[in-house]
Swiss-Prot record:
Organismal lineage: Bacteria, Pseudomonadati, Pseudomonadota, Gammaproteobacteria, Alteromonadales
Disulfide bonds listed in the record: none
Family classification: Belongs to the SlyX family.
Matches recorded under InterPro entries: SlyX
A Pfam family: SlyX
The species this protein was found in: Shewanella oneidensis (strain ATCC 700550 / JCM 31522 / CIP 106686 / LMG 19005 / NCIMB 14063 / MR-1)
The protein's name: Protein SlyX homolog
Length: 70
């Protein structure tokens, strides 16, 4: 009987560590999701700024001088 009790205790210990690991991983996933959301917001701000640039500041494809190898 002692062997069965030891096995049960070992399984309970492993389960406790797995629960802790799952919780730690969950917290990391939450942090990463927040980071991704922040980065998406920053990208949207950059897109808005790029779209707001006046076209006169940028040369069109026809106005660009061709590279020297042409």
């Amino acid at each position: 009987m002692q062997g069965v009790q030891e096995q049960i205790e070992e399984l309970q210990t492993k389960l406790a560590f797995q629960e802790l690991t799952v919780e730690e991983l969950n917290q990391e996933v939450i942090k990463l999701n927040q980071l991704v959301a922040h980065q998406q917001h920053q990208i949207q701000l950059l897109i808005g700024k790029l779209q707001a640039i006046e076209p006169s500041n940028m040369a069109t494809q026809a106005e660009e001088t061709p590279p020297p190898h042409y």
